[in-house]
Curated annotation (Swiss-Prot):
Subcellular location: Cytoplasm
Keyword Nucleotide-binding (UniProt): no
Any one Pfam family match given in the protein's UniProt record, by short name: ZapB
Keyword Cell membrane: no
Annotated gene: zapB
Key words, A-Z: Cell cycle, Cell division, Coiled coil, Cytoplasm, Septation
Ranges in coiled-coil conformation: 4-78
Annotated function: Non-essential, abundant cell division factor that is required for proper Z-ring formation. It is recruited early to the divisome by direct interaction with FtsZ, stimulating Z-ring assembly and thereby promoting cell division earlier in the cell cycle. Its recruitment to the Z-ring requires functional FtsA or ZipA.
Subunit structure: Homodimer. The ends of the coiled-coil dimer bind to each other, forming polymers. Interacts with FtsZ.
InterPro entries the record matches: Cell_div_ZapB
GO cellular component, one term: cytoplasm
Family: Belongs to the ZapB family.
Name of the protein described by the UniProt record: Cell division protein ZapB
Biological process (GO), any one: division septum assembly
Length: 79
Protein backbone atom coordinates (compact mmCIF):
# COMPACT_ATOMS: atom_id res chain seq x y z
CA UNK A 1 0.00 0.00 0.00
CA UNK A 2 2.78 2.46 0.78
CA UNK A 3 4.28 1.70 -2.64
CA UNK A 4 1.03 2.80 -4.30
CA UNK A 5 1.02 6.00 -2.26
CA UNK A 6 4.64 6.58 -3.24
CA UNK A 7 3.78 6.07 -6.94
CA UNK A 8 0.87 8.52 -6.70
CA UNK A 9 3.07 11.05 -4.96
CA UNK A 10 5.78 10.57 -7.57
CA UNK A 11 3.22 11.08 -10.36
CA UNK A 12 1.95 14.28 -8.73
CA UNK A 13 5.49 15.57 -8.27
CA UNK A 14 6.29 14.79 -11.91
CA UNK A 15 3.10 16.54 -13.01
CA UNK A 16 4.05 19.58 -10.93
CA UNK A 17 7.54 19.59 -12.48
CA UNK A 18 6.05 19.35 -15.98
CA UNK A 19 3.65 22.20 -15.22
CA UNK A 20 6.48 24.36 -13.86
CA UNK A 21 8.60 23.62 -16.93
CA UNK A 22 5.77 24.57 -19.28
CA UNK A 23 5.10 27.75 -17.34
CA UNK A 24 8.79 28.67 -17.48
CA UNK A 25 8.75 28.18 -21.25
CA UNK A 26 5.64 30.33 -21.51
CA UNK A 27 7.30 33.02 -19.39
CA UNK A 28 10.32 33.03 -21.72
CA UNK A 29 8.05 33.36 -24.76
CA UNK A 30 6.18 36.23 -23.13
CA UNK A 31 9.46 37.94 -22.25
CA UNK A 32 10.54 37.68 -25.89
CA UNK A 33 7.20 39.07 -27.05
CA UNK A 34 7.49 41.87 -24.51
CA UNK A 35 10.97 42.76 -25.74
CA UNK A 36 9.78 42.75 -29.35
CA UNK A 37 6.84 44.98 -28.46
CA UNK A 38 9.12 47.33 -26.54
CA UNK A 39 11.31 47.66 -29.61
CA UNK A 40 8.23 48.33 -31.74
CA UNK A 41 7.13 51.03 -29.30
CA UNK A 42 10.56 52.66 -29.39
CA UNK A 43 10.59 52.58 -33.19
CA UNK A 44 7.09 54.07 -33.30
CA UNK A 45 8.14 56.81 -30.87
CA UNK A 46 11.13 57.62 -33.08
CA UNK A 47 8.90 57.75 -36.15
CA UNK A 48 6.44 59.97 -34.31
CA UNK A 49 9.19 62.39 -33.32
CA UNK A 50 10.39 62.55 -36.92
CA UNK A 51 6.84 63.21 -38.12
CA UNK A 52 6.35 65.94 -35.52
CA UNK A 53 9.56 67.65 -36.67
CA UNK A 54 8.54 67.34 -40.32
CA UNK A 55 5.09 68.73 -39.50
CA UNK A 56 6.62 71.74 -37.74
CA UNK A 57 8.92 72.35 -40.70
CA UNK A 58 6.01 72.15 -43.13
CA UNK A 59 3.98 74.57 -41.01
CA UNK A 60 6.87 77.03 -41.08
CA UNK A 61 7.16 76.66 -44.86
CA UNK A 62 3.41 77.22 -45.18
CA UNK A 63 3.67 80.47 -43.22
CA UNK A 64 6.51 81.64 -45.49
CA UNK A 65 4.53 80.82 -48.63
CA UNK A 66 1.41 82.52 -47.25
CA UNK A 67 3.43 85.67 -46.58
CA UNK A 68 4.85 85.58 -50.12
CA UNK A 69 1.39 85.08 -51.56
CA UNK A 70 -0.01 87.99 -49.56
CA UNK A 71 2.86 90.18 -50.75
CA UNK A 72 2.20 89.22 -54.37
CA UNK A 73 -1.53 89.83 -53.99
CA UNK A 74 -0.77 93.21 -52.43
CA UNK A 75 1.43 94.14 -55.40
CA UNK A 76 -1.26 92.99 -57.83
CA UNK A 77 -3.82 95.22 -56.11
CA UNK A 78 -1.48 98.18 -56.44
CA UNK A 79 -1.29 97.69 -60.18
Amino acid sequence: MSFEVFEKLEAKVQQAIDTITLLQMEIEELKEQNNALSQDVQAAAGSREALVRENEQLKEEQVVWQERLRALLGKMEEV
